[in-house]
């Protein structure tokens, strides 16, 4: 929930005026915002923005965002404990190999593709994904 809240907040600046894609057909500021965001963000990004806006909305902020921040603190502390004994945490970048464009459209499956990358985002630790090989299905996979 924290990552969607942060994505919603961060992506709000992509208005087509100062940042991000700018729609060419808009005639006014309001239309520029609407068209730029409609054309510039794909369905998955829009879903995550909406989920993040929900998490940050009145009545849900404490239920989700505040509790999520507490979980983040626990995760940060546990990660620091791990780094006392180990120099690196090696994880696959995603739980599956890459998939063909538009092959995965289920929102839950798409969201779960981030399961291994979200750790570094939540704890504030640096991470990089590197190509690791090619699966027998011909699709690449990586580690981070």
Question: Could you tell me what each predicted segment is?
Answer:
Residues 3-9, 13, 18-144:
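Glycine-rich, small-residue loops and helix-cap segments
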């Amino acid at each position: 929930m924290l990552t969607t809240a942060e994505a919603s907040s961060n992506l709000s600046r992509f208005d087509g005026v100062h940042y991000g894609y700018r729609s060419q057909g808009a005639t006014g500021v309001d239309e520029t915002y609407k068209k730029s965001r409609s054309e510039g963000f794909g369905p998955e990004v829009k879903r995550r923005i909406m989920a993040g806006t929900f998490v940050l909305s009145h009545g849900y902020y404490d239920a989700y965002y505040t509790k999520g921040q507490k979980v983040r603190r626990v995760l940060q502390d546990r990660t620091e404990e791990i780094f006392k004994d180990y120099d690196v945490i090696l994880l696959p970048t995603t739980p599956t190999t890459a998939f063909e464009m538009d092959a995965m459209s289920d929102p839950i499956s798409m969201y779960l593709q981030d399961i291994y990358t979200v750790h570094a985002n939540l704890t504030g630790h640096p991470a990089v994904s590197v190509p690791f090989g090619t699966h027998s299905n011909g699709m690449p996979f990586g580690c981070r």
